[in-house]
């Protein structure tokens, strides 16, 4: 059976960094942003809406592979806490919430070329997830 860790948290919290620090060679990493870039997105975040269906199709295939036991360990990065818990329950995995204080998140957002969009996404994430963080 595959060991699955679903990692969630607001934009700029360090989800991808945390997974890269904990994953081992050969582990499957399912990361929306990484998939988008591999599919041709010119930016690392906030991809064109037309790409969403293609990205989710790749994620669905990866999840099917996890269910089929094709991987020893898998890491799935999803932003929302509720969806992370749903996936973990579906796959028999665990959830890790990566978070930082807002001042840290906003400082990291300032280093992105799309800082205003990222800051808005942080605020929206907080509004949608604040009561579901654990």
Where do the model's predicted regions map?
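Pre-Walker A (Motif I) flank of P-loop NTPase domains
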Residues: 1-5, 71-72
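Conserved GTP-binding G-domain of TRAFAC-class P-loop NTPases and closely related GTPase folds
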Residues: 4, 8, 106-134
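Hydrophobic positions on the alpha1 helix immediately C-terminal to the Walker A/P-loop
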Residues: 18
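Active-site signature of alpha/beta-hydrolase-fold catalytic machinery across serine-
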Residues: 21
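Conserved phosphate-donor/acceptor-positioning beta-strand/loop module used by diverse small-molecule
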Residues: 77-79, 90-109
